[in-house]
Amino acid sequence: MVDAVKADPFGKVNAIDVLDLASLEARAEKVLGRGEFGYISEGSDDGYTMHRNTTAFQDVHMLPRVLQGVENPDQSTTFMGAKLASPLLTAPIASNTLAHPSGELGLAKGAKEAGIMMSQSTFASKTIAETAAVSDGAPYMFQLYMPKDWEYCQYLLDEAKQAGALAIILTADSTLGGYREKDVMNHYHLKGRLANLEGYNTGQSGVGAGGLFKESMQKLDLGLISKLASYSGLPIIIKGIQHPADAVAAITAGAAGIYVSNHGGRQLDGAPGAIEQLPAIAAAVDHRVPIIFDGGVQRGTHVLKALALGADLVGIGRPFSYGLALGGWQGVKDVADHLKMEINIAMQLTGCQTMADVKQMKVKTTFA
């Protein structure tokens, strides 16, 4: 006899009409709690860097080619051996159940259905194993906030490796949280599970997620790269690189990838837009390791600009959270599909048949 029907782990799912990624924020605000929306949407301090992430794309101009014989552009690519339908990544975000009950499960399924890369935060609301079961072999990376407790770190690395993670993304720019005024005004404390921490401590649910960075090490150094690589046997990608010298130092210390990011403008306010730093960092990397980029991406043209300036994979954060809030995993897929549609149009109109063509596309900027 079949057991009683179990609760659907993906919760309520529905298709969403995506006009553009920017308009998703106002729609998501209507379905999210005030505190949850504030936590997801805000940047640190005055929000300059968060907004500059997007506006800086206006200072990058693509130089289209015509009569190139382009038809039905192919945006598929590979990253660290993983085949992807598009060079997109769900950037690591903490506690996705703030947006939707399915949390990382919905994010993973949406990414899998869209054929893009998924990454999971240390501070996820679902365990690595739970998320991996949904990913079911789809490309996946694990983002690590370096714990103070080395045994806990080993536990996370073991879980990630068993789950089939392609790489470990070590976040280096968030040894503590930026000052976020909406959280203060809303008296907001992050709700829900820190599933990976509870899995290590008790294996049970119910551990609150207050004091998000309490378990994280503040004094990070380059020696961690070889330590993590040696223990895990996985490639280590350093996230939060904003200076060319840091990229060079990380590669020299054994980093297998560089992740250009300012944490969505949620950490140090007053830093440049992430895209402004990408050309110099890409020049310093000089094709030695792959580059991931995130920061303010809201258009398919933004993706092409980042790729042309040196990125190999482009991360999207808040828009996927909003898609998840509005439609569960289907909303995540719909956001990805809309972005892929915009990428396809931009490739056709710039004369790019493949991602290799995009990488060779000429662009003009005011900062490179």
From Swiss-Prot:
Presence of keyword Hydrolase: no
Keywords linked to the UniProt accession: Flavoprotein, FMN, Oxidoreductase
Active site residues of this protein: H263 (proton acceptor)
Binding-site residues for pyruvate, renumbered to this chain: Y39, Y145, R180, H263, R266
Molecular functions per Gene Ontology: (S)-2-hydroxy-acid oxidase activity; FMN binding
Recorded superkingdom: Bacteria
Cofactor: FMN
EC number in record: 1.1.3.-
Catalytic activity: (S)-lactate + O2 = pyruvate + H2O2; 2-hydroxyoctanoate + O2 = 2-oxooctanoate + H2O2
Start and end residues of each FMN hydroxy acid dehydrogenase domain: 13-368
Major enzyme class: oxidoreductase
Cofactor note: Binds 1 FMN per subunit.
Residues that hold FMN according to the record: P92, I93, A94, S121, Q143, T171, K239, S261, D294, G295, G296, V297, Q298, R318
SS bond list: none
Family as reported in the entry's similarity comment: Belongs to the FMN-dependent alpha-hydroxy acid dehydrogenase family.
Subunit structure: Homotetramer.
Record function comment: Catalyzes the oxidation of (S)-lactate (L-lactate) to pyruvate, with a reduction of O2 to H2O2. To a lesser extent is also able to use 2-hydroxyoctanoate as substrate. May be involved in the utilization of L-lactate as an energy source for growth.
This protein's name: L-lactate oxidase
